[in-house]
A protein has these predicted regions:
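Boundary at the C-terminal end of the N-terminal hydrophobic targeting segment
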Residues: 18-20, 24-26, 32
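Intrinsically disordered, low-complexity linker/loop segments enriched in Gly/Pro
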Residues: 116, 139-223
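Short, structured beta-strand/loop micro-motifs enriched in basic residues and often containing a Trp
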Residues: 57-67, 111-119, 206-214
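Conserved mixed alpha/beta catalytic, RNA-binding, or beta-rich assembly cores of soluble enzyme
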Residues: 191-217, 221-299, 310
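Short, Lys/Arg- and Gly-enriched loop/turn segments at beta-strand edges
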Residues: 89-100, 140-150, 237-247, 337-340
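Bacterial N-terminal signal peptides
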Residues: 7-20
Length: 372
């Protein structure tokens, strides 16, 4: 029995499905006191709201796709916290010992879907289209192994560099928060969810690889413990998914994968924000705001990120985006997020202590501050 009898929970959740296959959330409110909800509430939490647990099983996960008509696997109230378990790629078929030939077959036999396994969706009571959902990452505990691989000649930014493919497995020392890449070379662990987001507006089943306004497969290495994802809501209940667990990754994710793993636990607090209206997701760290842009063309992704950053600065300083645009190059650090998710990503990091004035003050004396 894993946390609770999941079969009973999913059976109870099935009563939420309305006549003719239409989701009940399109017709009437859903109570957080449902039978399924009570099964998933656990006592003894130090985090905000009720505490829930959602394990990763074949009943609570999907392999490589989003669908906003998917039955919720958990219903929570705004402000509640969920400890979520995740699976490795391809419904748990990535694990130490798998050969690169086996991993390649998982991609070539299932080309229409992404490789990531997604736990969810989670329905958040009170979330409506036009709202913003705040998802704070409270805690991440990876499993004790990770993998980095390239499918032979097929994927990644530089497939020709790996014509035969490669896979390497690692032991993750969660106490030291490191892994040994080679004798004498240690890589610090910095776990984050590669995929975290809400249901897209469009009905139907979509490949989960490309990110978008709904967030999703951001692959942003700065979405770590203590940060909050702010994402616009497109369907009632938001419908939150999490997966594609990473133990570490560099900006760009240039060889297709980061240090791929699965999470024993990722603990998220979800809060509905009725006041903030967003068109694209943002990440809040203790010291910075991160704005994002996506496009198949990296230059256009940068332009989108720059526009979002100017919009953010304009909101903060109460000026027009045109006035804020020159500040982007002065106050923001723009980085390539990833180049492997069909739609490439660029993100710009802006200090919470953004410039106090858009106008540079007139100097009172000639100093090295102005001339060298």
């Amino acid at each position: 029995m894993r946390f609770f009898n999941l079969v009973m929970a999913v059976t109870s959740m099935a009563t939420l499905w309305a006549v003719a296959g239409a989701p009940v959330w399109a017709q009437q409110p859903i109570s957080a006191q449902s039978a399924a909800q009570k099964l998933m509430v656990v006592p003894g939490s130090k985090y905000p709201g009720r505490m829930h647990v959602l394990p990763a099983t074949m009943e609570t996960t999907q392999w490589g796709w989003f669908d906003n008509g998917e039955l919720p696997r958990l219903i929570i109230d705004s402000g509640d916290t969920v400890a979520i378990e995740s699976m490795s790629h391809s419904h748990g078929q990535l694990y130490p010992g798998r050969t690169i030939e086996e991993l390649k077959k998982l991609r070539t036999d299932w080309p229409a879907r992404g490789p990531m396994t997604l736990t969810g969706p989670i329905f958040v009571n009170g979330a409506e289209p036009g709202d913003t959902l705040q998802i704070k990452i409270q805690k991440i505990v990876p499993r004790p192994w990770g993998a980095n691989f390239n499918v032979p000649g097929l994927f990644g930014q530089f497939p020709s560099r790996f014509p035969d493919g490669q896979v390497k497995y690692f032991y993750l020392d969660n106490e030291k928060k490191t892994t040994e890449f080679a004798p004498g070379i240690e890589i610090p662990l910095r776990p984050f969810p590669g995929t975290l987001g809400v249901a897209r507006k469009d009905p139907g089943r979509y490949n989960a690889v490309p990110p978008g306004p709904f967030a999703g497969n951001l692959d942003n290495r700065d979405l770590v413990e203590g940060t909050t994802l702010h994402v616009p809501v497109f369907v009632r209940g938001a419908l939150v998914w999490q997966g594609d667990s990473h133990a570490a990754q560099g900006n760009g994710e240039v060889n297709l994968t980061g240090l791929e793993t699965a999470f024993q636990e990722i603990t998220l607090t979800m809060t509905v924000d009725k006041a903030t209206k967003l068109e694209w997701p943002r990440i809040e760290t203790p010291t910075e705001w991160i704005t994002m842009g996506f496009d198949e063309d990296l230059t256009k992704a940068l332009a989108n990120a720059k526009s979002e950053t100017a919009k953010f600065i304009a909101e903060q300083r109460k000026v027009s985006p045109e006035q804020a645009m020159p500040m982007v190059s002065k106050t923001s650090d723009c980085r390539v997020t990833q180049v492997v998710d069909i739609k490439k990503g660029v993100h710009c990091m802006t200090s919470k202590d953004v410039a106090k004035s858009l106008a540079e003050p007139r100097p009172t004396a000639e100093t090295p501050q102005y001339l060298v």
